[in-house]
């Protein structure tokens, strides 16, 4: 029998009370969650269609309720809030890691044309998940430290692998720079170049 650990969502209500939504999350456990930006990618810079006569103009910045969770089942799950049922539902499952997913970070999207989610794993990899439109599939890309980082000791890790467990990932406020914290005591900064390739632009030792 598979045991699922629960996700708890707390919201502040108008009557001054905390409301709790509880739902099944990941088998074994959940290590991290990250909220999606409150607006869709590109909605602030994309011209919106004009409303027909007699209709209300829809807001280009309507609120989005969505988050990602990182699990001990090696999966990343995308959750969305359904207004019709007033409940949270699993929208998508992202498969790519072979060990516990330690962290997940959804990038801020102001000015960005697509969604970016970074995940860090016990399997020594960092995956960048991109989604071009709300209906497009998620596409994953692995960061490759072997092309830019010298090993601290011993043999270099294989392509696509960091030297140790990757514990944390964090985006800059602009959403175009990713910090990666590895178990070997190094923090690296990564940026996507004009060709769509992720490059290490800074390397710091603790």
Model-predicted segments: where are they?
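WD40/WD-repeat beta-propeller blade N-cap
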Residues: 23-30, 36-37, 94-101, 142-166, ...
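Structural hallmark of WD40 beta-propellers
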Residues: 1, 19, 40-46, 51-68, ...
């Amino acid at each position: 029998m598979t045991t699922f650990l629960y996700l708890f969502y707390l919201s502040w209500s108008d009557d001054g009370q905390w409301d709790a939504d509880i739902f099944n999350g990941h088998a074994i456990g959940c290590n991290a969650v990250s909220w999606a930006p409150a607006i869709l990618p590109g909605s602030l810079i994309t011209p919106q269609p004009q409303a027909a006569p007699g209709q209300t103009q829809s807001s280009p910045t309507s609120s989005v309720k969505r988050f990602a969770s990182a699990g001990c089942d090696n999966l990343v799950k995308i959750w969305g809030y359904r207004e019709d049922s007033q409940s949270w539902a699993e929208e998508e499952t992202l498969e790519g890691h072979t060990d516990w997913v330690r962290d997940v970070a959804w990038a801020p999207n102001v000015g960005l044309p697509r969604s970016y989610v970074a995940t860090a794993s016990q399997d020594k990899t960092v995956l960048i998940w991109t989604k071009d439109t709300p209906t497009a599939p998620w596409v994953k890309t692995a960061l490759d430290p072997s092309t830019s980082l010298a090993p601290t000791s011993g043999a270099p890790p294989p392509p696509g692998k960091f030297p140790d467990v990757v514990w944390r990932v964090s985006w800059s406020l602009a959403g175009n720079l990713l910090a990666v914290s590895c178990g070997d005591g190094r923090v690296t900064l990564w940026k996507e170049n004009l060709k769509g390739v992720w490059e290490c632009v800074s390397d710091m030792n603790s």
